[in-house]
């Protein structure tokens, strides 16, 4: 290394590039999760492909400049916004493929069962090139069936799973034990990631 430090590249294992850099548009004054979700929901209808590309490219440049060589980004879609952000993130994955490895997670932020049409979009996202299947059982009902469905999709496409899991203030309604049991039952050990587990 000629007197310099040589280390493997760093990994950003959980980011939402399609929703990054929006705090200046509508601030989260309370700093709470509830307001963050509310503010983001208000802003999402204003996102265009050009807007997402500009913001996500800025984020990519920041990550690359700080030594990140592998990124897993959750990219959402639903019937009201379509694939605006998701398609843009897939485009950036291709554009930056010689610089950074990007894994795109098909992420149903608004739930699958409570948002009709999202289940079909999950399959479409996998066909479009998603690298992993996302889940958010705490924001859907019934939560265990949400977990079952995303496993079904992951198995169909032989992809890993990445869950936003039990992101709440209390322990009521937690599904992490069910998720662990399901992971073992399906032989998916080592292929399931969990984030936001705060209960």
Kindly give the residue locations of the regions a language model identified.
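Active-site mouth loops of central-metabolism enzymes
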Residues: 39-55, 105-117, 136-140
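Alpha-helical scaffold segments that flank or form the walls of functional sites
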Residues: 4-6, 23-74, 80-95, 120-127
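Histidine/acidic residue-rich metal-binding segments in metalloenzymes
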Residues: 84-98, 115-199
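Di-metal (Zn2+ and/or Mg2+/Mn2+) metal-binding site signature of metallo-dependent hydrolases
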Residues: 4-25, 168-169
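Conserved short loop/turn motifs at secondary-structure junctions
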Residues: 74-79, 108-110, 139-140, 167-168
């Amino acid at each position: 290394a000629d007197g310099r430090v040589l280390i493997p590249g760093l990994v950003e294992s959980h980011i939402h590039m399609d929703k990054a850099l929006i705090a200046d548009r509508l601030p989260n004054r309370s700093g709470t999760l509830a307001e963050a979700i509310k503010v983001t929901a208000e802003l999402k209808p204003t996102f265009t492909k050009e807007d997402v590309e500009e913001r996500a490219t800025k984020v990519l440049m920041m990550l690359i400049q700080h030594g990140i060589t592998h990124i897993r980004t959750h990219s959402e879609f639903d019937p009201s916004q379509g694939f605006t952000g998701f398609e843009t993130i897939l485009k950036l994955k291709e554009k930056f493929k010689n610089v950074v490895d990007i894994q795109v997670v098909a992420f149903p932020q608004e739930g699958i069962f409570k948002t009709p049409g999202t289940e079909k979009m999950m399959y479409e996202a996998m066909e479009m090139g998603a690298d992993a299947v996302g889940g958010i059982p705490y924001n859907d009902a019934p939560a265990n069936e949400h977990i079952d469905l995303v496993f079904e999709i992951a198995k169909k496409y032989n992809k890993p799973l990445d869950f936003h899991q039990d992101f709440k203030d209390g322990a009521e309604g937690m599904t992490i034990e069910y998720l662990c049991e399901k992971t073992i039952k399906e032989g998916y050990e080592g292929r399931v990631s969990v984030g936001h587990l705060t209960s």
